[in-house]
Each structure stands twice: as structure tokens, then as C-alpha cells.
Amino acid sequence: MSVIKRALISLSDKAGAVEFAQNLHKLGVEILSTGGTAKLLADAGVPVIEVADYTGFPEMLDGRVKTLHPKIHGGILGRRDLDEHVAKMEEHGIGNIDLVCVNLYPFAATIAKPGCTLEDAIENIDIGGPAMVRSAAKNWKHVAIVTDTADFPAIAAELEANNGALSDKTRFNLSRKAFSHTAQYDGMISNYLTSLSDDVLSGQPQIGEFPSRFNQSWIKVQDMRYGENPHQRAAFYRDIDPAAGSLSAYNQLQGKELSYNNIADADAAWEAVKSFDAPACVIVKHANPCGVAVAADTLTAYKLAYATDTTSAFGGIIAFNREVDGETVKQITDNQFMEVLMAPKFTAEALEIAAAKKNVRVLEVPLKAGANRFELKRVGGGLLVQTPDINRINRADLKVVSKRQPTEQEWNDLLFVWNVAKYVKSNAIVFGKGGQTYGIGAGQMSRVDSTRIAARKAQDAGLDLNGACAASDAFFPFRDGVDVIAEQGIKAIIHPAGSMRDQEVFDAADEHGIAMAVTGIRHFRH
């Protein structure tokens, strides 16, 4: 391990820079720097040499040319193990630069600002920074590259422990991270530029939703024992910029390692439960809700959700959108086996009770509003990309197409079952009353079959459908679904409409004295 004697620090994100530079100075490292970083360090009393003084060439072109100089890149790229390189560097007065600390202009923050112009974006495309990062990363055997200020403490500790040197393993890992950093940065620029509208040269072009070249960066969270099935290999990756409140922000408090299917089901449960404003419980099995309820507290919500389908709830994922107490966890553990229990927070008593089931995975996930910008689905040789289905409706958005108007209670129940239907695999039919699902029919090729399944689920659970409401995620292609619903004593239906036979469906509702509201919005889920 060679000792670091000279470092170059040039940062846009300067968090922790002063402390890190102070640690380097204590180890006798000479520090080169530029612009705002140099001023920050000098003001903090850290001895620093301006790059312009080091190279003998001033910054120019409004700061566009600062580090693009042979004394900088030669010092970074030169191989210390090649006599030819060493001789050339000595001939031209180029000294070694052993450590490079660089992060890049804030391009993402710039283009996120309202009114960002093309000129604004272009001026925040870093040139010298990526050049130094790539140079240092390429020459990792001799140069360490730090692009993430969060790494400063660990690097400082290793330098102190090794008398100013870093291991080959550390330098190589930093190199890999650096190349990922520049790849993500260039991908972000490409996404922005290729999503601009045709009036790109107008100064303030419109940004389209889908770039012509689509680049995404992901960070591996874990390798998994296997994938959806034991013969499949798998890993879990986190979006480099995840949406607020997304599952990837989970903190696992206890239990076995999450499996591929655990994560897929937990995501379905979390997206569903956080869509409710009132305290809610969602129980998911094979990515489908099998019981959902809203109530005044988590215990009541769980009891109602569980009552929908006690058989399917076995081995399920249970999610809440409120802090969970000990009484709720005790009720769950007394009732059933579960794979995952998740909520924004758990009381100390709740965790103590859950600890008795040591294999149960307990997750805390921040409850924040937010959705991924895109949903992605791989197909053979391609990728389907769409915006997320985050549409929410209220009573004012609905149109009543039946002779009978819904009652106040029916209005509330219609909105509830409609929200649940959005998270059920198509074809989806949901029956419910009083903030509780009574029957869920999911994933059938025929809508009337999903309707019959929902009715059978309610019957098996001993739940009386008289006066309940029904939701369909898409229109009824024929009146048969409405007829089956009417046979159950259900008195109100919500669905998108849009079928060629809509009038036939509306007439069927009137024949049965059913109140029918249409949304104009479909919620297919595949």
C-alpha cells in the first residue's frame, strides 16, 4: 500500500469536506483545490494550494477550464510502476496526485427547478469533474477516487489506521463506485436531452415524459437465496433516487432475510395501505389483497380485514398505515401465521410481542406521499414504461347513471371498494360495506367469474352481502356481472363504464334497483 501524499479536492456537495481535509492535513497530505472548495478549506484554516497556482495556468472561460491540464491529469493517470511514465512525469515536472475527491455539478437539482432553460441545464453539465473521476478510477491501483461525501469518515479512518495508505480492495471498490457515478450522471443528462420537445432551441423547451434513450441506475441491496422459484437466481436493487415513502426505504427490525416473493408482496401491500387516509390494514397474498379494512384503530382494522378471508390470510403480508400497538400484534399472532408485518412505526410492546415469532419479518417503512416517476415491465427484448396509476377520485368525480341515487353510506362504501379494486389483479371485483371488504375476486380471464368468486368468498366468510357495494376495475362487457351482483343483495356498483353495451348494463342496474356510479377511469392491473 502506497502512502497518499497529495490530494485534489473539488466538490459541488461539500458536506464533511472540512473535517476530511483536516484529517488529511494531519497525515501530512498536500491538498490541491479549486474555487469554492478551496475557499471553504482556507477559511477553515486548512492549508490548500489553488489548482491555478499549482499548474501555473489560471481558471478561464467562466470556470469551464480549471483542472483540464497535463499537470492534473498526468498526475492522476501516471502509472507509478512504469519507469517510462515516471521518467516522463519527472521530465515535465508533473507530480503524483494520489487521492481525488470530486463530485459533480448538481444537474438533477438544476433541471428539477421550475422554469429551467436549456442554457441553465447545459451550464450545469460537468466536464472537468467526470474527466478527473474517470482518470482516477482508471488508475485505481495508484490513485484513490472518492465521489460520495458519505465515504469520508471510513476513508479517513482507514488512512489513519494504515499511516496514510488505502488498501487495494478499498481503491478498487472506490473505482467501481466512481464509474457507476459517472455512468448515472451521463445517463441523467441523456434522459433530459432526449426527452426535450422539438422546439429544443427555443430557450425553454417542453420536457416530454419519455426520453428517446432511457437510462436507469439501480443500487444492489442484496443477493437473494433464490427468485420467484427455487431454481431462479435473484437480487434486489434500489432506485438510485427512490420515491418518498417507497418500500425500498424499509428498515427491517427482526426476522429472516426478505425473499423475492416477500418483497414483491410487501410492495403490493404497502402501495395499497398508504393510499388510505383513515387507519387501514391490508393483507396481501400472491400480490393480491385478500382483506382490506379502514377503522378507528389498527386493531379493529386488522380484525375486519382478516375476517374477509381467514384462509387466504395464512402466510400473508400484513400492512398498516399507522403505528401498531401490542394489542394489535397479539391479535395477529394469536390468529395466524404471517410472513411480513409492516407499518410506519411499532410500539415497544408491539416489538416485544412480535419477537416471540422470531422468523416473522417486521418492517418499518416511512409513510410519505410519493410515487415512482415510472413503472417498468420487462418484455422479450424490450421494456414497457408507464406513469404510475395514482389517480384518486372523490364523490364529485362520479356520475350516477342509474335511476336510484346512492345513499350517504353507499357513497362512502363505493369510494372504499373502488380504491381497493385499484390494487387487485385484473379482472378485479371487490365487494364491501362499512369500510371492510366482504369478498375479492381477482385475476380471472372473465369478469363474471371474478364476480362469482367474490360472492363465494363472502359466503365462505359468513359475511352478509345485503346492502353491500361492488367495484369493478374495468367496465362490464355484458350485463351478466350486474345480474350476479344483484343476486347477492348488493345495492350499489361503481365501475368505469366505456363498453359498447353500457346502456344494457345501466338498464340492468335499474331493473334490480341498484344505484350505479361511473368513474370514467379504468384500473387494469396485470
From Swiss-Prot:
This is Bifunctional purine biosynthesis protein PurH. Keywords: Hydrolase, Multifunctional enzyme, Purine biosynthesis, Transferase. Belongs to the PurH family. It holds the Pfam family AICARFT_IMPCHas. It comes from the Bacteria. Its EC number is 2.1.2.3, 3.5.4.10. CDD domains: IMPCH. The IMP cyclohydrolase activity resides in the N-terminal region. GO terms for biological process: 'de novo' IMP biosynthetic process. Residues 1-147 form the MGS-like domain. GO terms for cellular component: cytosol. It catalyses: (6R)-10-formyltetrahydrofolate + 5-amino-1-(5-phospho-beta-D-ribosyl)imidazole-4-carboxamide = 5-formamido-1-(5-phospho-D-ribosyl)imidazole-4-carboxamide + (6S)-5,6,7,8-tetrahydrofolate; IMP + H2O = 5-formamido-1-(5-phospho-D-ribosyl)imidazole-4-carboxamide. Pathway: Purine metabolism; IMP biosynthesis via de novo pathway; 5-formamido-1-(5-phospho-D-ribosyl)imidazole-4-carboxamide from 5-amino-1-(5-phospho-D-ribosyl)imidazole-4-carboxamide (10-formyl THF route): step 1/1; Purine metabolism; IMP biosynthesis via de novo pathway; IMP from 5-formamido-1-(5-phospho-D-ribosyl)imidazole-4-carboxamide: step 1/1. One of its GO terms (molecular function) is phosphoribosylaminoimidazolecarboxamide formyltransferase activity. SMART domains: AICARFT_IMPCHas, MGS. InterPro entries: AICAR_Tfase_dup_dom_sf, Cytidine_deaminase-like, MGS-like_dom, MGS-like_dom_sf, PurH-like.
